[in-house]
Every structure is written in C-alpha cells, then in structure tokens.
C-alpha cells in the first residue's frame, strides 16, 4: 500500500511539473502577452510595411536611413514588404515579423485572432488617405446599383470601410472585388469595374491617370476628418524582450515625420525613390502631390476611433461581434520617445492595459 501511495505521489508530482512546463512554453511562445525579461537590443528587427503613400513614414525612414541610424550597428534592420494587411497579420501571428506598419482593420484582427496575446499597437503613422473613386457618370451612391467596386483585399482596412458604407447605403446588389491595386487601375481603365475604395497613391492614380472622380473621401465620414489609416504594431514578446529596439524604431518614425513637416519636397522624393525601387515605377508629380495632400503623418494612434472601427467590422459583415480592444494599446515606448523629443504624450483612450 505504501508503494502504491508513493507511486501515486510521484505521478501527481510529474503531472504538476508537466503542467508547469506546458505553461512556460505558452508564456514564451509568440502568442503570449506574459511578461518576458528585457534582453537588451535585438540582433535584428523585421519591419513590415506596404509600398503605399499611406505608409510614407516607413518609406521615408527606410530611404533616409532613419531606422538604421537609430537602431545602430548592433541591430540588423530587415525591411519586409507586404501588399495588404491580412498577409502581414499572418506574418505577425506566425512570428516571422517583429514590427509592422499596418492598416487599423488588420491590426484589430491580429489582436482579436490571438485573444489579445500576440500584438500591441504602439503608435500611429498616418491619418486619412483613402477614397472611393468612380466613373465620371456616377454622381450618387444609388448609381452604383448592380455595379462592381474593387478594394485591395478581403478584410483589409479599405474592404471594411467599403462594405460598411455599402451596408449603410443599402446597396446590397453591389459586387465587391478584391484585387491588387495595380490590377484595379487596369480594370478601371478597361471599364471592367465602376470604381474602387483605395488607399493612396492608388486613389490619386485612378483620378489622375484614368479619369476617375471622388464619390466618397473617407475623411468626410469621421469627426474632424481624422481616422487611423496606418498604425504601428509589435509582437508582444518582442516588445517585452527588446524595448530599446522598439524605441529606436519609433525615433526613426519621428524623424520621418519631422522631415515631412520641414522639407515636404524631400519627403515626397524619398517616398518616390522607394516606390520606384519596390514597384519599378515612380509617381508623377501630380499624383504624388495629390496623394500627400490627402494624408497626415502623425504618431497619434487616434485611439478613440478604434471602438467604432471594431463595430464597423460587424456592420461590414466581416465579423460576427465587435472585438474587445482593452489592452490592445501599449504607448509606453512611444510616450517615452515623445517626452524625450519634447512632444506631448499620446492617449490610449482607455484601451491600454490597466
């Protein structure tokens, strides 16, 4: 009997240890929000971004070397290009990306899909810069009945905005076509689609290069015309382990914003150089000027807009319930950098961890 009790005790101990090890494995995984020890500067940082004017801060920072300068020689910068938010979300959740410039909609999705564990929103990047542009003969929403409208990708920021707007306009017979922005430009020129809800510079390209006109500027749908088109997110584990690396990237972000404010011509040139390198073609002066006129580069994440953005996913039919966003924001690194630069702190609107 004593041997049997001893065997049961050993089994219980083994199970307890196994459970503890299992818990440790989850805590150390890429999808955990559990605190991790500060390990100093990262050996490398994988930075995601899009070849769009709405990601101007990222493009400027890469072109001018701001991120690399702020990171220093001890951290390798690995820029990683994406064309739409859902693909970047997959990279973040899979642990193959550390920090990403991304649309507000996919950022919310990344937080929701990981049950609030894997990512934190650490800064704003761009407000504005998205429009529904259409054929010249379309003068009102009701003219879109039975038509095809394009956007970049199912579930991305513009896809949610378009589908929400269509639902509010009761345009249930409009077909939404998800396709690459360059394909959209070609399709519009051929008359295959009636319009598209696009980020800059693509809305400007359809206007300047293909004769489209603006039916809806998304600015008109938001208070003060401000809404978060592009934000910056980080893997929670990377933030905990390498806070100084995160701060360095955010300093590069501030540098990019400063250039845009003090020397807009050079900021535009920097963006155009990056677009040429990434896509093989640069923007005409008319398109570049129009695209820049519709955006605001800002580190303010406009956190107060996010509950509405979450609800918009339900209205758009891409989510059954609005994701809960408490704990999504961690502006500690940003506010440290802003304070050092003598700038006012950013507000998380109660969506940070308490």
Q: What residue ranges belong to the model's regions?
A:
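Short, solvent-exposed loop/beta-turn-alpha elements that line the ligand-binding surface or hinge
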Residues: 68-74, 220-225, 292-301
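Hydrophobic/proline-rich hinge and linker segments of small-molecule sensing/allosteric domains
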Residues: 27, 120-140, 223, 227-236, ...
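Pocket-lining segment of extracytoplasmic ligand-binding domains
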Residues: 182-276
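Secondary-structure end/capping motifs
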Residues: 241-321
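Short, glycine-/small- and polar/acidic-enriched structural segments
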Residues: 31-178, 194-200, 216
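Conserved C-terminal helix/tail region of periplasmic/extracytoplasmic solute-binding proteins
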Residues: 311-354
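Sec-dependent bacterial lipoprotein signal peptides
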Residues: 1-22
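Bacterial lipoprotein signal-peptidase II cleavage site
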Residues: 21-35
């Amino acid at each position: 009997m004593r041997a049997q009790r001893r065997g049961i005790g050993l089994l219980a101990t083994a199970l307890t240890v196994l459970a503890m090890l299992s818990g440790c494995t989850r805590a150390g995984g890429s999808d955990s929000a559990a605190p991790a020890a500060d390990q100093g500067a990262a050996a490398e940082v994988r930075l995601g971004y899009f070849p769009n004017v709405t990601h101007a801060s990222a493009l400027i920072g890469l072109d001018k070397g701001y991120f690399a300068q702020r990171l220093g020689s001890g951290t390798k910068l690995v820029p990683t290009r994406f064309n739409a938010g859902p693909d970047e979300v997959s990279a973040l959740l899979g642990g193959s990306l550390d920090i990403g410039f991304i649309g507000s909609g996919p950022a919310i999705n990344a937080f929701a899909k990981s049950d609030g564990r894997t990512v934190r929103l650490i800064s704003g990047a761009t407000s504005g810069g998205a429009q529904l542009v259409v054929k010249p003969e379309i003068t009102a929403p009701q003219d879109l009945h039975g038509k095809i409208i394009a956007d970049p990708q199912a579930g991305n920021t513009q896809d949610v905005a378009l589908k929400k707007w269509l639902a509010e306009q009761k345009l249930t017979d409009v077909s939404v076509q998800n396709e690459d922005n360059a394909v959209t430009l070609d399709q519009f020129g051929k008359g295959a689609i009636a319009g598209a809800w696009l980020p800059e510079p693509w809305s400007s390209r359809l206007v300047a290069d293909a004769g489209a006109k603006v039916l809806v500027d998304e600015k008109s749908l938001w208070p003060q015309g401000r809404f978060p088109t592009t934000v910056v997110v980080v893997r929670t584990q990377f933030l905990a382990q390498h806070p100084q690396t995160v701060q360095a990237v955010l300093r590069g972000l501030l540098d990019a914003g400063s250039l845009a404010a003090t020397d807009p011509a050079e900021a535009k040139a920097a963006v155009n150089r990056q677009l040429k390198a990434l896509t093989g073609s640069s923007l005409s002066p008319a398109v570049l000027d129009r695209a820049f006129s519709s955006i605001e580069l800002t580190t303010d994440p406009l956190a107060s807009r996010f509950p509405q953005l979450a609800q918009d996913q339900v209205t758009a039919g891409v989510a059954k319930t609005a994701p809960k966003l408490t704990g999504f924001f961690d502006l500690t690194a940003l506010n440290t950098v802003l304070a050092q630069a003598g700038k006012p702190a950013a507000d998380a609107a109660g969506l940070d961890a308490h």
